[in-house]
Amino acid sequence: MQFDYFYGSQAEQFSFYRIPKVLFTDPQFKPLSTDAKVLYGILLDRMNLSVKNQWLDEQSRVYIIFTTEEIMEALSCANQKACRLMLELEKDAGLIERKRQGLGKPSLIYVKNFAVSS
């Protein structure tokens, strides 16, 4: 298959996941796998939907719901890898926090803002 070039404003025709450059440049995040960094970008993107839907907890913190199955679909990976990447973001980097809801409901995911220290 041969692809054509971009012409003029065509370069703006796609939507993109935004991954903060600091995840690649800051020594604190160097140990994170590239897949975990990509997943963080996907989770940040999902936050836009949560903001539109006003998914806020009692402390006005934005949360997302993104199941393991959705991660597997987004990254074309197996369950084990999806779970490992979430653990990497949560335990190793502290970039997300999960809150279990119980009763078979998916966990709430808080995507952390690493640019602001609390």
Question: Residue locations for each model-derived region?
Answer:
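Winged helix-turn-helix DNA-binding recognition segment
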Residues: 47-111
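Charged low-complexity intrinsically disordered patches
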Residues: 115-118
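Short recognition helix of helix-turn-helix/winged-helix DNA-binding domains
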Residues: 1-69
